[in-house]
Amino acid sequence: MFTGDRSGEFLYRALYEAGFASQPGSLERDDGLVLKDAWITAAGHCAPPGNKPEPEELRNCRPYFERELALLREVRVVVVLGKIAFDTYLRVRGERLSAFAFGHNVLHDLTPALLCSYHPSQQNTSTGKLTQTMLNEVFQRAREIIRSAPDRAEPHPL
């Protein structure tokens, strides 16, 4: 996911700078990129027209998203990229959306911790709404959360 596109350029550089990726970019599936202490998924898995998935796509992908989360172990922080990911993640958890506000680099006191970022879409990065420095700061903060979290070997609490 995000391999070979402009969003991926921003994302993988930030992951690399924070120690979550073995290299600062990924151009193709088998280019040697290895993630460490990280898992990348999406609420919708198809490239949506107009950069926004349709509600039907999100509904269709939700069982896969839920299953992926249920398989993860030792989750200490979830970084959501964009408001759609934020809303979808909270819905999957059964949380009231009105109890949480989305904002860049906003941290929510959940277990695991929930850290928000603007999506690294070409629209956001070309307009300066999201800069490389801003995204790097989010993943550096995620790394700090992991370092300070107590050790545990529990599945993601869904």
Give the residues covered by each predicted segment.
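A polyanion-binding, active-site-adjacent surface
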Residues: 1-148
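Generic C-terminal helix-cap and adjacent flexible tail
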Residues: 144-158
